[in-house]
Amino acid sequence: MKIAFLTAGGIAPCLSASIGALIDSYNQLAPDAELMGYLNGYRGLLLGNNYDFPSSVRQKTDILFKYGGSPIGNSRVKLTNIDNCIKRGYVKEGQDPLKVAADQLVNDNVSILHTIGGDDTNTMAAQLSFYLKQHQYELTVVGLPKTVDNDVYLSLIHI
């Protein structure tokens, strides 16, 4: 099983600790699972830029609890803003960013994607989850809220 993380939106103190806590949890619950992060959020997902967490990192997560920000970087990319994704070179003309993201997850053999961010990040996670289900991709997307605005309204959405 391969589990991926991405952080998106604005930089916040909880991002690094969230990744550390997820790694610690998977170390206990699924020690054989492969863990990776998409570099710079949804941009990294679209471009296929990722980092596999080696065992040396998985065993030293305590450092992730000491620093804010995100060790895998953030970006503000909306998968539903096709024109912006094309303009920035994340997808080519005629491509659907949701499909590009879904196909990248499949190419990377990801079973579970954890997205960590605010309302836009979680809206994109819901859109991606809906797209995956609608097109019979066998993947799970889990959104982890990171917001000081209290603007992530639903804690559980069944699609």
Predicted feature residues:
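Short, acidic/small-residue loops that bind anionic groups at enzyme active sites
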Residues: S129-L154
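N-terminal phosphate-binding or glycine-rich loops at protein starts, especially the Walker A/P-loop
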Residues: M1-N50
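Conserved small/polar residues in nucleotide/adenosyl-binding loops
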Residues: I157-I159
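Glycine-rich nucleotide/cofactor/substrate-binding loop typically near the N-terminus or early
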Residues: D32-D108
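Short, ordered loop/turn segments at secondary-structure junctions
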Residues: A8-G10, Y38-G44, R76-V77, G118-T121, ...
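Short glycine-/acidic-enriched loop or helix-start segments at secondary-structure transitions
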Residues: L15-S16, L47, M124-A126, Y153
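Short Gly/Thr/Asp-enriched flexible loops that form oxyanion-binding sites at enzyme active sites
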Residues: S18-L22, G117-H135
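Short glycine-rich or small-residue beta-strand-to-loop segments that form or flank ligand, phosphate
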Residues: K2-A12, P71-G73, S111-G117, G143
